[in-house]
Amino acid sequence: MSRETASSEITPELLLRAYACGIFPMAESVDDPTLFWVEPKMRGVVPLESFRIPSRLARTVRSDSFTVTVDTAFDAVINGCAAPQPGRNNTWINHRIRELYIGLHELGHCHSVEVWRDNELAGGLYGVRLGRAFFGESMFHVVRDASKVALVHLVARLIAGGFVLLDTQFVTDHLRGFGAIEIPRRRYRALLDVALEGRADFGALPLDRPVPGAEALKAIADRSS
C-alpha cells in the first residue's frame, strides 16, 4: 500500500487484520499525515517465560509507591506516548495513529496501563490484544521508573491471562534489561500463528481496581506452576 493512500484506507478493523499478518503502521513524524506499513526483518519480542525484573525495580513495584490501573485513561496515555521526552524529541504517533488506536480501544482490542503518583499520570503504555498475543506499541514516563512499572504489571497480566506472545516490534536497551530479544521474521510468524490460536483473558487480574505490586509479582513468579 502506498504511503499516500495508507492513512485514508486503514480502519481499526483492517488494522487488526494487519496485526494478524505481522505488520503494523507508522508515521515518519507527528507532523506527517501519512502512514506506512512496517514488517521488520528482525522482530522484537519479550519471552514471557524468561521475563526478568531487576531487583531494585522489584522493590519499587512491591512498595506500591505508584498506583497502577488499566483502561482508565487511554487517551491520556497515548498522548503521553506522543509527547517529546528526554532523548526522544520526535514521535511517530500522529493524529491518524491516535484515531486508529482509540478506535481499537473502543472495540476492546487496545488497552492501556496507567501508572499514577499522587493522582497524577506518571507514565504508562498501550498496545493491541489479539488472540493470545499482545503487541506493545509505546510507553512513556514523566516520573522515574513509571514506564518500567507499567511493563511489569502488563507482563503479570499477560502471564495470568494465558498469553504466549509479547511483541515489542523493535528492541531497545531499555527492553533488553527485561529479557527482550530479536528473532527472524520467519520464526516470529510461527510464534504469531500459535498465538492467534485460542483466546487469552486480559482481565485475569482485576480490571476494576488497582492491582497491588505484590499481586503482580506473584503472577510472574507463579508462571511455571
UniProtKB/Swiss-Prot annotation:
InterPro entries: Acyl_CoA_acyltransferase, Leu/Phe-tRNA_Trfase, Leu/Phe-tRNA_Trfase_C, Leu/Phe-tRNA_Trfase_N. Gene3D superfamilies: Leucyl/phenylalanyl-tRNA-protein transferase, C-terminal domain (3.40.630.70), Leucyl/phenylalanyl-tRNA-protein transferase, N-terminal domain (3.30.70.3550). GO terms for molecular function: leucyl-tRNA--protein transferase activity. One of its GO terms (biological process) is protein catabolic process. It is found in: Cytoplasm. Keywords: Acyltransferase, Cytoplasm, Transferase. Its EC number is 2.3.2.6. One of its GO terms (cellular component) is cytoplasm. It is an enzyme of class 2 (transferase). It catalyses: N-terminal L-lysyl-[protein] + L-leucyl-tRNA(Leu) = N-terminal L-leucyl-L-lysyl-[protein] + tRNA(Leu) + H(+); N-terminal L-arginyl-[protein] + L-leucyl-tRNA(Leu) = N-terminal L-leucyl-L-arginyl-[protein] + tRNA(Leu) + H(+); L-phenylalanyl-tRNA(Phe) + an N-terminal L-alpha-aminoacyl-[protein] = an N-terminal L-phenylalanyl-L-alpha-aminoacyl-[protein] + tRNA(Phe). It comes from the Bacteria. Belongs to the L/F-transferase family. Functions in the N-end rule pathway of protein degradation where it conjugates Leu, Phe and, less efficiently, Met from aminoacyl-tRNAs to the N-termini of proteins containing an N-terminal arginine or lysine. This is Leucyl/phenylalanyl-tRNA--protein transferase. It comes from Nitrobacter winogradskyi (strain ATCC 25391 / DSM 10237 / CIP 104748 / NCIMB 11846 / Nb-255).
